[in-house]
Design a protein with these regions (language model features):
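Catalytic machinery of carbohydrate-active enzymes
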Residues: 1-238
Length: 238
């Protein structure tokens, strides 16, 4: 298939490169493509955490093999492996271009902002239209002096059956990041936006699907990591 040919081309390219260190920090289900990529990096030092791929690693780290901790704790282990024992900050650090920030500041002016991100890229990370309507009505009722701005893929936002909702006039995701920085409250089903809100210490209501398997509790590993957040986990993974 075309996808497999592209994978072989990528592997050939990787064999010609030399990296000081390669990180394989996440657990996955066994994947032949993943194995191909790792085997193509045999001349590089690979620090990995997934026991399925021990044979490809220069060093296998057994941190949190039972997956009971937040992923940020793994970042600490990576830093210790590279730099030795010490105190490390795992706070998120997001760079924003000045022109992007300026456009967002001009867009919001002196208004206060509530962000609603109701439709994630994955089908399991989506609110129903009825849920969206209820949340929107509650925001308009209790945050009457705030602008409620919907973010997400433009084609998805067009499907929301609420007349005249406000969205960003910019398509690039970096503007959503900037809007989050200057917002007052974030409601999101999208894990990326939840963690962006955490970077800026924004009060957040985060909706997560339950994990498909108890062996990989994604709602725990990728929880908001923000003391100003409330996490709601679905009773099912749909």
């Amino acid at each position: 298939s075309t996808g497999f040919l592209k994978m072989l081309t990528l592997c050939k390219h990787l064999r010609d490169l030399q990296f000081d260190i390669v990180l394989d920090p996440f657990e996955t289900m066994p994947s032949f493509k993943h194995s191909l990529i790792l085997s193509s990096l045999k001349d590089s030092y690979i620090l990995g955490f997934d026991q399925w791929y021990k044979r490809y690693y220069s060093f296998y780290h057994p941190h949190d093999e039972c997956l009971k901790e937040h992923m940020s704790t793994r970042a600490t282990e990576i830093l210790k492996h590279i730099y030795g024992e010490g105190e490390f900050s795992t706070d998120y650090d997001l760079h924003l271009p000045v022109d992007v920030e300026d456009k967002i500041k001009e867009f919001i002016g002196d208004t206060r902002i509530v962000i609603i991100n109701p439709l994630g890229a994955k089908k399991i990370c989506r609110l129903t239209f009825e849920q969206i309507k209820v949340i929107y009505q509650e925001m308009k009722l209790h945050f009457e002096n705030y602008r409620v701005i919907f973010t997400g893929l433009p084609q998805d936002l067009l499907t929301i059956p609420i007349p005249e909702i406000e969205t960003l006039p910019f398509n690039e995701f970096i503007y959503t990041v900037a809007l989050t920085k200057y917002s007052d409250f974030v409601i999101s089903v999208d894990t990326a936006l939840v963690h962006i809100a955490a970077a800026y210490h924004k009060p957040t209501l985060a909706f997560y699907p339950n994990s498909r398997t108890p062996e990989y509790p994604s709602h725990l590993i990728w929880s908001p990591n923000n003391h100003k957040s409330i996490q709601i986990v679905s009773p099912t993974f749909t």
